[in-house]
Design a protein with these regions (language model features):
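Short, charged beta-turn/beta-strand-edge "cap" motif at the junction between a beta-strand
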Residues: 1-2, 13-20
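Short beta-strand-centered aromatic/proline hotspots
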Residues: 21-39
């Protein structure tokens, strides 16, 4: 995919597995992320995600260590043209 590079800012749509059980209503919200690795040429990437969790009222949830987290890492994330939970997309450009 053209434009894929480490350091690019993209959008990540929060998946319900990123959230605590009582916060599933936040699935699909879009947050900022940075590409930290390009996994393949077909647009699969690893991301560091940056939720505005203190203002949005939710915390990301790590299944391995069940505690609130700030930034979080997502591996092997697929691209979506439009925001879709668990996938990344390019930020829209203003015209």
């Amino acid at each position: 995919m053209e434009g894929l590079a480490i350091g690019r800012i993209v959008h990540y749509s929060i998946h319900e597995s990123d959230l605590k059980p009582d916060q599933k209503q936040h699935a699909g919200e879009v947050i900022a992320a940075i590409i930290v690795a390009v996994v393949d040429d077909d647009s699969m990437v690893n991301l560091t995600c940056f939720p505005d969790w203190s203002n949005n009222g939710f915390f990301t949830y790590n299944q391995a260590t069940p505690q609130p987290l700030g930034m979080f890492w997502k591996t092997s994330v697929k691209h979506s043209q439009d925001p879709e939970p668990g996938k990344w997309s390019w930020p829209p450009r203003k015209k």
